[in-house]
Amino acid sequence: LMGRLSASHSNHDKLYQNLYASAYDAANNTATLDGYVDTTKRKTSIFSYDLTGEFETAGITHSITVGAEYLETDNDNDRYHANFLPDYNSDPDTEVFTIARPLNISGNVGVNNDGNTTTNYYTGANRVNADMTFADIKVLSFYLNDEIALTDSLDLVLGARFDNMDIDVTGTTTGADEDDTISPRVGMILDLTEQASVYASFSETFAPKAGDQYAKVSANDEKIDPNTFENLEFGIKYDLPIGLTFTAAYFEVEANKPEYDVATMTSTMVKSDITGFELELIGSLTDQWFVSAGYTNLDAKADGGNPLREAPEDMFSIWNNYSVSDRLAVNLGIIYQGESVIKTGSSAILPDYTRVDAGASYALTENTTVQLNVENLTDELYFPHSHSTHQASVGAPINAMLSITSKF
């Protein structure tokens, strides 16, 4: 038997703020701006221990893993409303601006549609605290996995995981949830030849919330309920003679996840069915050239037949890494994502986009490497995500990061 103990602790401090168009008046060519600042302080501790070993029964080899995991998160979330002063529309949370490109506001100071200067206060004595929420999340898990070598070419995988999740939310709004779930897993792997194998698997997955956002929780809200998934998958893996490995997989996923409705400011569980397939090529074409390419096709529908939010039909990526010398390597990648609806049942879409990334690394010594990564090389304007139909996230423009990594 071999035991493994793991412990980790993280401190997370995040702030994001947003000004967005909450209303539009076509007749007067104006837009009403609303906004918020959200701060999150989170501490997470994770402890896990597992045992692995092998034994035989009646000539059949079992590879066993058994373990336990405990997660605890303390989450402190504050939200502050926009506060436009002087207040010209009897609602300091919003202000009306004439539509122009760019809009006449910068650094939270702007001129409204009547020509009056107004300032939005996110900090200082004039800021307005809209919500204070404290969340305590505890998850205790036990798991068992057995890989059984039935023959030299056939393996059976059996497993199960028990999760107990307890979430307690207090503050401006309150809520609580406790769930006990057993998630089974079964799979089979058949080696057809030394180069080819096929597999099939079924699993249920229970995904507790990780403590990111718990603001505006009501007693009957499903926002803090866990995500649940049923996954059925089968596929093939083949080692090509040119140094690449090809994999193809078909999958069906039945998911239950809470989806937030901006209009009602509550979350409801949305059941969805996702079917699709994945194709992947990965490996080394030469001693110097490594390539990874993948394509995914999705057919994602909610229970009523509407397209599922942010589930594009087509996704493609390719990544190349070329070793110029023992010390210098360069890389180039392309990511494509097809269009998707912003909200389940909505006709508003996030348009498709293509992003090009590049980079280079140089080994200064055996243990120290300097690396330059450039994201969005062509400075593509794209929208990877949207909170709602009027709050789309803009992808970062061309940017670069230089890092030095040392191993001790």
Predicted regions span which residues?
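C-terminal beta-signal and adjacent terminal beta-strands/loops
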Residues: 339-343, 361-408
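Face-selective signature of the C-terminal outer-membrane beta-barrel domain
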Residues: 1-12, 35-170
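Surface-exposed extracellular loop regions of Gram-negative outer-membrane beta-barrel proteins
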Residues: 74-76, 166, 176, 189-233, ...
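Gram-negative outer-membrane beta-barrel transporters
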Residues: 152-153, 249-254, 267-344, 378-381, ...
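Transmembrane beta-strands of outer-membrane beta-barrel proteins
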Residues: 1-5, 62-68, 156-158, 198, ...
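Outer-membrane beta-barrel channels and translocator barrels
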Residues: 1, 52, 56-59, 151-153, ...
